[in-house]
Amino acid sequence: MLLAVRRPIRILEVGTAVGFSALLFCEYAPEGAQITTIEKYEKRIPVARENFRRGGKEAQITLLEGDAAEILSSLTETYDFIFMDAAKGQYIHFLPDVMRLLEVGGVLVSDNVLQDGDIIESHYVVERRNRTIYKRMREYLYELKHDERLITSIVPIGDGATVSVRIK
């Protein structure tokens, strides 16, 4: 629905996985939209490429292989829609580059931000191995809600998502 409302032409996805979201972006974005997607996990990359080929969308989707932090820091083009669906504990580290790349009026959607609702639990209720991820996600949510350049809403459905619009 956001793609239908915003009609983005330059879309950036951080976290390709097998390419499902990128293919959906192709389906719902306006004609001529270009999708750039980033994936690090070597086993997913050939699956995503094959899915793009089978969907006939190879010309519309550019898959960048490697570490998202490194790739984001090297990008110079701005985007009018950015979708974050990568390593959840890294969102906070990606944010400075994502903000640099998101044009004024652009939309940032971050997926899985509530971690099945556990993100609102006490630090001590969260399993020890997940505490760093949850701490970083709380920091990320705080930054989104308090950054004067953004208007952000948290959508508490499933694992949660945020929808942010850059206003400055």
Task: Report the location of each language-model feature.
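S-adenosylmethionine/decaboxylated-SAM
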Residues: 1-168
